[in-house]
Amino acid sequence: MQPTSAVSRPAWVNAMNALTGTGGTIRKSPVEIVADAASVVTRSPYAEFTGIRTGKLGRWTDGVATLRADRATFASYWAAHNEQVRRERASQANENAYADPLWVVLGDSTAQGLGAPGPRGGYVGQALTQLRRTTGQHWRVINLSVSGALTRDVLAQQIPLLAEEQPDLVTCGAGANDILFSAPGKLFADLRELLKAVPDNTVLLDLPLLTGFWGIVGRISVPYISRMNRVIHEVALQRDLPVAEVSAHFTPPWAGKFSCDNFHPSQDGYRDWTRALLAAVPASSLAMS
């Protein structure tokens, strides 16, 4: 297959290249950075002898590697799905037919559904099914999210694509990756800038509090996430935007709610995210005709 020229590439390809570099390598998530460091131990000559390789630490690094391999599969699925939705909507427009309501998703790997068995097992796929069922309308979704995206990436690379889509509903959930990649001042400034840039028909997702989970790393992250959530709710109040309170729905007991990397939700965990999102979608959106 011949490489696609830059001119003829779909917008999502150019956005991906701008975000990750022309090689298309997605930025590592915080959990991948920690796992790579841990792999120095689990792959050492002594790991098999001491049992580390097959122990809890070794199984965890293997789980992270599994989800890392899934990223490209999930990204390819949503890219193909997005293009199919665009073609179908263009056909409806050409025929002056009723346009199905459109939901556009902004975010990171959780919006991609990473951690579920397949892309449709995340909160986007689950919520889409519920939206169609509860409204009786054939909602469409275009998922612009990118695994590893920071808030500034969503602002610079995903927000500009909204003008092409003309969505009826937008959701935006990002920020977890910023904790290792941004100084606190930059982190909160970027978050505020993103939240002020989303359109008026946006539902914001706050972040889950991993209290007591994932050991000391989870506990250290709590003050940052708590402050990020305060910023999200503060800006949402200023702009009169609804917030999907993932922090209130995705809670202990954790059994079965996390995937093999002990960071991303499992399909069961994403059910909590789905409930949080659907509870926040305005009635005006659900009543669209």
Q: Where is each model-derived feature located?
A:
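N-terminal secretory targeting modules
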Residues: 1-104, 117, 133-136, 165, ...
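Short, conserved loop/turn and helix-capping segments at secondary-structure boundaries
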Residues: 21, 118-121, 222, 226
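Alpha-helical interaction segments
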Residues: 67, 127, 260-264
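Short, mixed-charge, low-aromatic patches
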Residues: 70-87, 109-117, 144-151, 186-195, ...
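Mixed-charge, polar/low-complexity N-terminal
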Residues: 75-79, 85-86, 91-92, 96-97, ...
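Conserved SGNH/GDSL esterase-like catalytic core that processes O-acyl groups on lipids
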Residues: 102-104, 110-189
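Short hydrophobic segments within beta-strands
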Residues: 106-107, 205
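Alpha-helical cap/lid subdomain in secreted, periplasmic
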Residues: 156-289
